[in-house]
């Protein structure tokens, strides 16, 4: 167990975000690969160790890790590799498959994956995706769903906050982006011409993984620079937490009970349906203790004299540090424990050399008075950009079940 003060020396409030350009923020979330591998490509099963090594080399989601596979015992789990014409392993993905009752057909799913050289994929999508489709057909899948992680567009936080304050954010399609990726547009055009239908577009209550996420760029930025990128209220709250004596510590599976109590309290307060405690215990155990490992998880607790006021589950995968779930009590809210917790996690991510702090998704249809708007504003206040990815698409492989 590690205990820290959220900030021993918080600099004076300084106006301005001090953040790099939007394209640099995109690079912080997704690296481009060069030179491009040589096709044609083939896919075949690989070991879980090979999957993890490839994911760490190319970058990828926690949902594509062998650790995540361990949290899905009811699914068939396959580590799949992409091989170049030279026989080199150039990509990998975790395929989760689930059989239909009484039928010899399955649903195949790669959440937020696979991990590929996506800049190269966008140049010739069929060369990369068609071998996967053929493999899934051969495995008896009736449908295949992919979470295409290529960054499409970005919005700076001020743009989104301004739109919300002026009457609500009904759709990101009507909001001019800070950056727009030609590679993503090319990939989307290829998908639209084919049988790939979009899944879960719109708010995050829909099925599937979020298409819009909030990400703080950490690449080549110090903790002070990230702090300057937060809004004034966030910086004030970090100072308040320090004055209130809030300390932040990291714990393992032993922190699940307290975490779930706070998470469940938050669910009642914010009107969402909470996951079972066993889900979180399984996740922390699967990813392993702490966040020092390249693939690992920890529960962060913000407390005053041992009274835990806020708790959050964090996962690290390579250069990405992700805030997955959190909860806070209504007790002693003036201590600003949630701000202290997030600030400490960001500082830890910087110390670990991570390039991005991922605050995950949000509801994308928000009015100024929506109960979920506060969560988005909380994420924007920390200096997070809104990142849109190409998102989830599904193809039907066999209609004759």
Regions found by a protein language model. Name each.
Residues 130-131, 281-400:
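Aromatic (often tryptophan-rich) hydrophobic motifs at membrane interfaces
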Residues 142-149, 249-251, 301, 356-358:
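A structural signal for short, well-ordered beta-strand segments and their strand-loop junctions
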Residues 75-77, 138-141, 295, 351-354:
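Short, high-confidence coil segments that cap the C-terminus of an alpha-helix
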Residues 105-156:
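Glycine-rich, N-terminal phosphate-binding loop and its surrounding beta-alpha-beta segment
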Residues 40-86, 90-104, 151-153, 194-334:
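A conserved beta-strand-loop-helix scaffold within acyl/acetyltransferase catalytic domains
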Residues 117-121, 268-271, 331-334, 365-368:
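A generic structural signal for short coil/turn motifs at secondary-structure boundaries
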Residues 2-38, 151, 155-221, 355-401:
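Active-site/acyl-donor-binding loops of N-acyltransferases
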